[in-house]
């Protein structure tokens, strides 16, 4: 799967605010996933 990266000069009607919220959501989702994984491992070996 190839991701087409838009070049800087042709930014299609995208908020920097929206992009920041998207990155924040990705970061929080990833952090939540790893917390759940750590808790499962802790319960298995606890």
UniProtKB/Swiss-Prot annotation:
It is a single-pass membrane protein. The keyword DNA-binding does not apply. Keywords: Cell inner membrane, Cell membrane, Membrane, Transmembrane, Transmembrane helix. It is found in: Cell inner membrane. InterPro entries: YmiA_put-like (IPR047744). NCBIfam families: YmiA. This is Protein YmiA. It comes from Escherichia coli (strain K12). The lineage of its organism: Bacteria, Pseudomonadati, Pseudomonadota, Gammaproteobacteria, Enterobacterales.
């Amino acid at each position: 799967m190839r991701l087409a990266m838009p070049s800087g000069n042709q930014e299609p009607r995208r908020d920097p605010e929206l992009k920041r919220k998207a990155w924040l959501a990705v970061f929080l989702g990833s952090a939540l996933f790893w917390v759940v994984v750590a808790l499962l491992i802790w319960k298995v070996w606890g």
